[in-house]
UniProtKB/Swiss-Prot annotation:
GO terms for biological process: negative regulation of transcription by RNA polymerase II; positive regulation of transcription by RNA polymerase II. Keywords: Activator, Nucleus, Repressor, Transcription, Transcription regulation. It is found in: Nucleus. This is Mediator of RNA polymerase II transcription subunit 13. Its main location: nucleus. InterPro entries: Med13_C, Mediator_complx_sub13, Mediator_Med13_N. GO terms for cellular component: CKM complex; mediator complex. Component of the SRB8-11 complex. The SRB8-11 complex is a regulatory module of the Mediator complex which is itself involved in regulation of basal and activated RNA polymerase II-dependent transcription. The SRB8-11 complex may be involved in the transcriptional repression of a subset of genes regulated by Mediator. It may inhibit the association of the Mediator complex with RNA polymerase II to form the holoenzyme complex. It comes from Eremothecium gossypii (strain ATCC 10895 / CBS 109.51 / FGSC 9923 / NRRL Y-1056) (Yeast). One of its GO terms (molecular function) is cyclin binding. Coiled coil: none annotated. Pfam families: Med13_C, Med13_N.
Amino acid sequence: MDILETSFRLEDVLSSYYRVEKVVRVNYQQFVPRTPDDQWCIQSELLIRKKDPKALVALFSRELWCFSINDQDLPMPGLEGIGEPPNSEKKGHFTPGFSKPNLPTPYAIFLKALRRMIHINMCLRSQNRLVPFGNTCIFQRDEKASSVIHFDSHLFENGDLTVSLCTKDMGFERLLSGAFTGRQVKRALYLAPSGIRAYLPFPDISKCLVAPPKNAHLLLVTLLVSHGIDLTQAKDLKWIKLVPNINHLNGYTPTISRYAEESQTSKSVIWPMDLCFQQTPADACVNTTRATPLDIGLQDSFDLIEDFIQLKLTSAYRIPGTSVNANTATGNNPLSTGGGFTDQFQPFVKHTNSSSCNYGPASRTKLTPSKAQDLRRSAAPLSADSFGNGFMTTPNVNENMGSVIDDMVICPSSVKSQNDLWNDRKSSNDDIDSINPTSQQGDSARITSGSEEQDVEVTFDKDLFGDEDDESDLFGDSSNKSTHRKEVREITDEMFDSAEIESDPEGKITPTGTSINYSTQQQTPLKRKYLDIPLDEITLPAAPLYTDPGAPLPVETPRDRRKSVFAPLNFNPMIESNVDNKYKNGGKFSFDPNEIDEPLKFEVSTTNISSSEEDDSEFSGDDFDELQQNNLQDIRAMEVGSSLQQYDMGRPINEFLNQSDSAKEDYLLPAYQSGDVIDVDKFPSRESHLDQIWKSPEINREDTPHRIGLPIIKPQLDGSGNLDIDNQITDNCSSNYYEPTPVVGADEKIQERTLHKDKKLDQQGDSAMASVVGDYSLAIKETRESSNGLPFLLRHMPLFSIPDVFLSKNPIVKVDSKLEDFLEILCEQLVFDQGFLGNFDVDPPTYKDVKLNEKGVIRETLNSVFSEFERLRGNEIISDMFYIKQPSVCVKKHGNLIKLKSDAESFAPLLHLKPSRGMKSFRGLFLTTILTQTCVSFITELAHIYSAQELGFCELVKLTNDEHNGLIVLNNFNTDTLLLLSAQIVSYCSTNMNNVKNIPLMIFLPVAPSSLEATITMTSKFQLIKNEVKSRLPDVELLLKLIPFDLTKDPVIMIDRYYELCRGIYNLLPPRTVKFASIADNLPEQVEFRTSAGNQNQLSHYDSYIHLAYTRSIDREWLAAAWSDSKGTENMVKAWYLGNSKARFETACNELWKLTVELASRKYGRICLILTRMDSVLPDDELMHWRRLSVTTRNLHLAVVCVGASTKVSLYDEDQFYPSFKPLFKDKRYANKIQANQLDDYEVVNIDEELHGVVFSSPLQLANSQHRCAIKSGALVRFKRCAGGDTLDKFEVNLLNCPHSDSTKLLKTILHQFRDIASLNTWFCISRGKDNYIPWHVVAVKKIMRFIIHVNGIEEK
């Protein structure tokens, strides 16, 4: 049955839009305060909302805007008690036919006022089940389950004022008292209604609960009036002290790779606990069962094990002057991996992983007393020959032989020679740990345990040579008998360490914790023993050891208690009298124990503080008139990578890239005055010399808002702020909204440091809210509470600035010169993996359609505030819906080039299809730490299938005679092991590849599936090998292929899986632009005659199309891009680390454009670049760079589109008959019987590859840009495998500009282009099934960013 046998009825498509009003015009009036510091606008908005919650009013920067629809009256702010209203600056109206793509300022503010009005009435009617949260609402189904509901408004050109409803599950839960009890899970906290990121000041949430502030009633009433949140009658309302994220308050999304880290500031805010929500990290796993506690009697055994560990750390490592030869203990061939040849490569960290395996998770969680006894019984007896001479020279070994046996039972590798890293063929007891990425990266001596991710740092210099801290213990009592004398407690550094840890149970002193933390009561044997130092190493040749048996042991000197590294400082006595005491006490690091830590105090400026998340930093074109001509060029060169502007929170809505007026290009750049901010860095001084101590930490960015001219919320508490309006505030305003939290016994101190202007600021800050309460007043006392909540009532962060998914533990990469090559390797592994690596458990949630009840809160509320409420159907918003045919791809069969439909990919192994552009051969080498038969069969079968499918030839490399072909078994993946392996690869390549064509060597490395850390670690291991080999043989090409470890352990693997893996290897081999298949050229259905007459800009035909998709992480740390042409013959992926640096971002943009121009140079004729910005957003700083770069290339025509697979607009399918496969899912009896003699008349169709194009009647607003609208909107849609009644898969495409006059034709061309290259997902081994309706280059960028955004880049200092 043909999929197009029936016609599709647009009436059966339900959209997520609901018509609420029929608009002819929208009236508006703008009020501007008389002075920049006037709070009249804030007071007026609250009073209007108190009088009428349905009023359409909004704050925008320093202005108050009032709106009405059609003939309704404008809400007037002329009310008593708030002073004389200022003159209206602007009054007028606009119609639905507003300009695009840049929305006029009144329309954008109208949408904001509409959304605020909907939120307030929803919350009032729902009895706080719907709580405003940023620019959205949180619907609480119960105490733990909740979802986010969006109410987005849009005015169509036909006058339909609509509200779009959608929901998204981001895992928000209401903060409860027991949320942080027990083992701490690093959850993210947020404040409602602002959506600001916050932190707990103490790990125990019970310590964060505080008494209500004295102006609590004022705050609750303000919440009721401004947001509809009614907590005034709440019983047992709890108040909690939280630390807000000031960066997020100012528009910066906290770095997602460090999202779970604690705040760097101690300034706090007191907030109702019912308005606090938590978000759990994706990798949080709550263990309901605890491991069996170790018996107390094992303490002595662990002491003996520790003695033996220290013995091995030093005695196996020889130093000059020792009596034992360096190769005696190992006796290995210097040419083999792990022999004496490794001494030149071995740093001290080599011994960490191999000899300390009892620190791993197995020794803590698996080693119960009963299991330890079972292992001891089953252990084979060991002879003295098992140890090298280096071990036997150490005294007291025989006394500790029991611990030696225990150590070998627990960790068999601990008794092996440290240099025997390769030739050991034994399989580890825990094969997962053998490839665990906990091995050190580079030369760092870090051991990460599996379950608790704890680090143990071993300083070998101290253990080997003995530093100044160990001199007093060097000749101490080394007898084991002292360990049994529990009354002996020698004063050591470890005692103070344990004291600090005991006083800090949450691990603040030692953030990473200790490697072993056994909960025992008998921990008295704390003396450190030096049994591991051989006699010939601790004696000098000229001074023989004194061996008088009657001589007493040296008396150890007690150690001094640890002191601060900063204070007190010791100075030369000659100058000590001239040194100021503050330097002796540590300077800025000094701390007075009598000082009082108090919550952060905010003050609010009405100059550019708004209740919008998009327009808090509005500025006008007049701001640029004051710029001096000599500074204009410097400001132009400055990037507008602002926190608010990046995601359109501070974009000037009334100005946008006027192409005709070059002077107006400066509107892209903000020119904020420093006085138009609220200063968080200025706090009242306590003493004159301690002013700087209490400053809030600077924003941890290279481009601070001060440097790029951004508005920052900072409470100016020194009286120099914007709120100093003495004449406007009378003595009757007695609110205490900004005073510090009182502390018992500190009244006099607070009085001394409270300035006169601080009192005035406190009074006028509360006046904005106290005016809505009526007669409510708060007497001014000498000690007053802090109610620093006004900024969290005025700011509303967009949900887009909050990550959908974050992790509590993130992999780390070093930001150095090698990072670019590392990212290139990593991107290829992430993109062309055919889904083998998994989704890393970081799949973001998607928007879903909302099904409304007939008598639900949403329907009743919208019916009460609007004149109508009717859902729009497809025929009302869609102008055209058309079927897009599948493209044909080029492949080879029996040596001939053929064309076949793109959905035939699943039959490729059965049809014996070959690559269209020739074979690629390679040499293979699989590295593992475990020798199993499945690993041998896996690599052998892989090589056989690759050659049998005629993809090329695969030669399995054999480095040594005793190895299997293509398989190397390593003892570990430590640095020294890999360096030695690199030396053997160099030897092999120089011997076997001199007179042969340069065939690349592909190294296969096993990784744990869906493991971020394993992927990063193994990629870094390969980069180490690659750099080492290419430093000696630059012409050798090394490639990487990560293989999931489960795949190598599976003895039964389907041939199809092998074939998919082989085709993925083919796509990775050079030349990388040559893939298995490409789009075939089709003959045109009609011939078009084009002449050169007329304006070239009006020509709508292009000879070639280049597609560039890119996205930038919401924290501005990473940038990813992918290139493709319309046939897929040109393809490339790349990523950059930005680190929130404007210089790096500009460099990345320049490089990105350079690569695009190079690709365009290989094309001919008129070329159109389809610049695709993902996430349905286009920040101004990015657009500025594209405009700057596009003018440098005249033969490259730029078309900018914003796309999104998960947007707030959804289409619900109710058609039961189209496409024709729907009846088959409903009832299989509708299927026709297949006629065996007419098989040639049938056609096999993959319904996952059947796509339709949609063109909307009116352009849609960008989902995450409130001030920008498309000039034409469309989508690629796919029907799901069901009988109907489900949401369509939709890939939304919004065209922002058109190089010619026919935007509809260009949009349809782009939809056809996207459909064609979307069919390459499976052929390029990028995606299978799920994302086949999305172009491959968009899917590639999405896969890169989904992973790399959780990687923590560490700058080298």
